[in-house]
């Protein structure tokens, strides 16, 4: 089952395809399809101006409502304090949101984070109105043949704008969940001013991240950490020099693993409450079953290039001692192949886009060169120094990010349907 961790990474940052649900490629570029003709450019500018005006009115409406309330407590971030003192505010997340709705939510996150849910509801209502309006026009309007190309471009442009807005709404909600947990996201990884050259100068917050998950889910997360850190699990102060690209791959894979774990854990906790768990997922596993489970983990290690690269060539046998039996792992191993594949699939293009863009904001866009022999040229691959404690913090954040992403995707889909499966 944990071979899923390795199979999830199919490109330098994220996998290249979703399940066959008609959603197309999972690898999304940072900017949606654009048009080079001047007419379309004017249309795009007009659409963005209209969206910006709507967001400005929304901000005025929400802040006016907040001012009339005497008893609310504003949980202001350090960024708002910096802004009031005239210094440049620090970003609260690596990815800077670009759409008018995204920038609007960024302001709310900094100044009035408790108003984010209301702001999101407002933005989703506007998205639904826009989508309904376009659907009615498509059904009722008789478009002359000479205008059909322009009409399709307008519709495509609006759809791309809605998708980007939806991505940034999801991202803002994930960031808000980290703020509620009082855990700051790791900033963009850049050359360090630390004398040791280490990039991991951020706060650890490991205990807070661990407490955000159910006991059964954390057992799986601990095993995931054991696969990545190997024998260094007990020596977190050691520093390693490792490819920045590899760290980015591990981070992205861990986000997707967290998404998968939360999805499975949600079903597990429900069946546990209803006392309908399958017999194989209780704690009465035989030693043979436990040995088979450990073998599955060892097989996952041998097929996981990122794990092998970071752990310094530790063998699968070396990892075996770190892997512990887990009720949730036994539960997942009881799935048939079709169910396992379905649970391992990220459901929406928007969620995939967030994973890709957030990872690129953290580690930069990888510059990958393929040699004539078909191998990857690593000469331009930047090396960074990071402690194993810093790597543990990154992985825990990534798994938590994926878990939160599952939560907010489900929450938003209940109000604005966009998940295809």
UniProtKB/Swiss-Prot annotation:
One of its GO terms (biological process) is response to ozone. It is found in: Plastid, Chloroplast. Residues 74-88 have a biased composition (Low complexity). Keywords: Chloroplast, Plastid, Transit peptide. Pfam families: DUF760 (PF05542). GO terms for cellular component: chloroplast. PANTHER family: EXPRESSED PROTEIN, UV-B-INDUCED PROTEIN. This is UV-B-induced protein At3g17800, chloroplastic. It comes from Arabidopsis thaliana (Mouse-ear cress).
């Amino acid at each position: 089952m944990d071979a899923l961790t390795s199979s999830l990474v199919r490109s330098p940052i994220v996998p290249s395809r979703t399940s066959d649900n008609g959603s197309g490629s999972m690898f999304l570029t940072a900017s949606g399809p654009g048009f080079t003709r001047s007419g379309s450019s004017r249309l795009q500018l007009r659409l963005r101006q209209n969206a910006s005006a709507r967001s400005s009115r929304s901000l005025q409406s929400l802040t006016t409502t907040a001012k009339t309330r005497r008893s609310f407590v504003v949980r202001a971030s350090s960024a708002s304090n910096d802004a009031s003192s005239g210094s440049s505010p620090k970003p609260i997340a690596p990815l800077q949101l670009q759409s008018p709705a995204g920038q609007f939510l960024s302001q709310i996150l900094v100044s009035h984070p408790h108003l984010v849910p209301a702001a999101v509801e407002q933005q989703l209502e506007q998205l639904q109105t826009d989508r309904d309006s376009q659907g009615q026009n498509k059904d009722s309007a008789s478009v002359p043949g000479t205008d059909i190309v322009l009409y399709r471009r307008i519709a495509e442009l609006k759809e791309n704008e809605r998708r980007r807005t939806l991505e940034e709404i999801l991202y803002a909600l994930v960031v808000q969940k980290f703020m509620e947990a009082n855990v700051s996201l790791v900033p963009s990884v850049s050359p360090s001013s630390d004398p040791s050259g280490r990039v991991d100068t951020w706060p650890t917050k490991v205990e807070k991240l661990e407490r955000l998950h159910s006991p059964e889910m954390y057992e799986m997360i601990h095993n995931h950490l054991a696969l990545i850190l190997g024998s260094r699990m007990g020596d977190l102060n050691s520093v390693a020099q490792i490819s920045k690209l590899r760290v980015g791959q591990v981070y992205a894979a861990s986000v997707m693993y967290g998404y998968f774990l939360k999805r499975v854990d949600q079903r597990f906790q429900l069946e546990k409450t209803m006392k309908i768990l399958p017999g194989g997922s209780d704690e009465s596993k035989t030693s043979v079953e436990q040995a088979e489970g450990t073998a599955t983990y060892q097989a996952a290690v041998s097929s996981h290039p990122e794990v092998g690269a970071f752990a310094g060539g530790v063998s699968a046998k070396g990892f075996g001692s770190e892997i512990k039996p887990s009720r949730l792992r036994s539960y997942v191993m009881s799935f048939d192949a079709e169910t396992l594949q379905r649970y391992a699939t990220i459901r929406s293009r928007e969620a995939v886009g967030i994973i890709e863009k957030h990872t690129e904001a953290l580690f930069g866009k990888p510059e990958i060169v393929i040699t004539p022999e078909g191998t990857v040229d690593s000469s331009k691959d930047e090396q960074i120094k990071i402690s194993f404690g810093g790597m543990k913090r990154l992985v825990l954040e990534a798994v938590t990010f994926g878990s939160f992403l599952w939560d907010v995707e489900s929450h938003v889909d209940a109000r604005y349907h966009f998940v295809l499966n």
